[in-house]
Amino acid sequence: MTSSLVLALVSGLAAACFVDPGSGSGGATGDATGGTGTTSPTSDADASSGGTTGMTVTTTVDPVTSSDGSTGGCEGMCCGDGTVDVNEQCDDGNKVDDDFCAASCVRVAYRVFVTKQGSVLSGGLTEADEVCHAAAAAAGLPGVYRAWLSTSTVSAKDRVTHKQALPIRRLDNQTVVMSAADLVSGSLLAPIAVSEAGELLPLMPACTEESAVWTGTLANGEPNADTNCGDWTTTMGGGGAAGFLANADASWTDAGCAVACGASLHLYCFEVDP
């Protein structure tokens, strides 16, 4: 009787201490989200070690995004990428404030230069503008440029206009005029004697190929109609009105001389709005 009671007690204790690994894996799961990721702990029972339980933690981190929705670096329309987008006044590909285009892609000033090399014109205003464009591109200058040049029906002052009344500067940052309207005032703050390469050209006597600039334009910005080499379409006969690059008075655009149409003269190239 006593032996039977003891056997029953031992069997009961053994049953109470037994745990089925398949039903008691201790598999607790959790989910913490706070903008940086999700952590999910899981348990892994190793049957070979007698039911010893280990913990594996898996973490997922969300990618860091910028205010424009990109995931590092600039994507799409960005100030400073060298391309003028619809929401920008200019974009010279840098983040420098002390130049013609501020770091915020807001225009500060317009550029002007005189071509280093002379040109014999026979293709009208289109050819002259192409000369300016090619010179600027070769020098790595951004923007759109037009030649200060008049024909019998088109005035230079109407070709060089700006949406904003901002200074016009040489490439050495010297201000030429405070706005395009001042180009017909009869004087400049500084002569347009710096080339697309930023070099000050040698100051030679007026009305020579070394110092003369094709303009066909009077001091008031209107055409000098009698001396424009057939609206800059011929290199034969006659002469074209020229300016003097060394001067800041009215002779910068009208030096009072007509140079042979076949001559190779400089051009004034002004940056304009795209």
Give the positions of each predicted feature:
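N-terminal targeting leaders of exported, membrane, and organelle-targeted proteins
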Residues: S11, F18-P21, V108-Y110, P274
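Cysteine-rich modules of extracellular adhesion/ECM and protease-associated proteins
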Residues: M55-V57, V64, G72-V108
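Ser/Thr-rich, Pro/Gly/Ala-heavy low-complexity intrinsically disordered linkers and tails
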Residues: L13-C79
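Sec-dependent bacterial lipoprotein signal peptides
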Residues: M1-A15
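Functionally engaged cysteine thiol sites
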Residues: C17, S25, T29, C79, ...
